[in-house]
Structures are given as C-alpha cells and as structure tokens.
Amino acid sequence: MKNKIYFASPFFNPEQVEREERLKAKLRDLGFEVFSPKEAYFCKPDEGDEVRQMVFDGNCKAIQECDILFAVTDGKDMGTIWEAGYANGINSVVYPSKKKIIVYYCETLPEGGKFNLMLAQSGDIIITDYDDMDQLPNLIKSGEVKKYHGKIE
C-alpha cells in the first residue's frame, strides 16, 4: 500500500507553481500517492461561503486521512503553515495512535540560514536540497527522523 501524502504548498506565482509540480512529480516517481488540495479543490478569491467551507472541510479531511504531510515552507505561506500546524495538532491530541509523519521542504534555506523554531521542532524530516528527496522513502520506511539542528528564528 502506498503512503498517502498531503502536499501543502504555496502556488501563487510561476516559481511556486513550477516547484510544486516538480516536487509532486518526484514524490509520485518515488511511489507515493499524492493528494494536492489545488488539484482536488479550487476556491476563487470571490467564492461564496458555501464553497469556502466545502474546500476547508475537504482539506481538513484529507489531512486527517493522510499518512504524511509534506509542506513546502519556502515563502512562508500562511495556508501551508496552518496545514502543518493542523497535522501536528492531530498528532498531539486527536489521533496520537496514528501519528502522521511531517516533512518540511525548504530548498531556499541557505547553508547556515535560520529555520523557524516551531517548524524545526514539529518536523520529523527536514529536506533542504532537492537531491535529498531520494532518501525520503527509506527514511519513512525505517521510521528514522531527520531533524533540523541549525540556527532557528
């Protein structure tokens, strides 16, 4: 059975969209089943309350049902950070027996750069280089954590 990934990422400019598509393709190539909220639900900026609630509920349900939350933290998108916090809250309070693996991807973090304290502490696996993506299946299968130990902000 494939591990189900909830793919949290900003997608508001061409660079973000390119990174999102590249990473989703890589995760699928690595054998993961990838849920993309952008592909499943799309909410226009002027959408009414009913559609907004449907999108919100659908995304929350998908986070609850995933095995892994993969969050692209480049750009510090508020929605992505909220999704990661929700997954961490589920781990802590709601479903502690079915712990989700939280992976943060930050390719724009410079060597020696500062990573957010809350993300550093809640992430099970931190990836800062695209080439390290190939390690992800083995890290998940082994249960190994790859925490961030650099400077924090």
Task: State what each model feature region is.
Residues 1-153:
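Conserved catalytic or regulatory cores that recognize and/or transform ribose-phosphate-containing ligands
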